């Protein structure tokens, strides 16, 4: 399986203006994140103290990754980077 580092940031213009609405939305989103962590779909997740940016480690196919991130669009923007394990990188280096 391919491993991805997914960084994300909130789109300010798409965030609810009222704090009560923001809390409700964020709690709903966090339920899906916690479910993905429990199921193993996400390997790790972190969020900055301001709640406006963070990261996730996802392992799977490109399609599964797209399906996971699309549920948060247009509220968040994502950048995905394919990651190699240490062993994979050693293999690359040995074949240079």
Where is each model-derived feature located?
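A common structural junction motif
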Residues: 72-80
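Short active-site oxyanion
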Residues: 52-55, 77
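Helix N-cap motif at beta-to-alpha junctions
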Residues: 58-64
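Short S/T/G/P-rich N-terminal loop/turn motif that feeds into the first structured element of a domain
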Residues: 1-53, 63, 84-96
């Amino acid at each position: 399986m391919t491993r991805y580092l997914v960084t994300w940031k909130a789109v300010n213009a798409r965030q609810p203006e009222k704090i009560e609405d923001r809390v409700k939305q964020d709690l709903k989103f966090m339920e899906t994140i916690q479910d993905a962590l429990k199921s193993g779909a996400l390997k790790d997740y972190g969020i900055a103290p301001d709640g406006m940016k963070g990261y996730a480690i996802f392992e799977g196919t490109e399609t599964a990754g797209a399906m996971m991130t699309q549920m948060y669009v247009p509220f968040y923007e994502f950048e995905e980077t394919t990651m190699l394990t240490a062993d994979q990188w050693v293999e690359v280096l040995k074949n240079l």
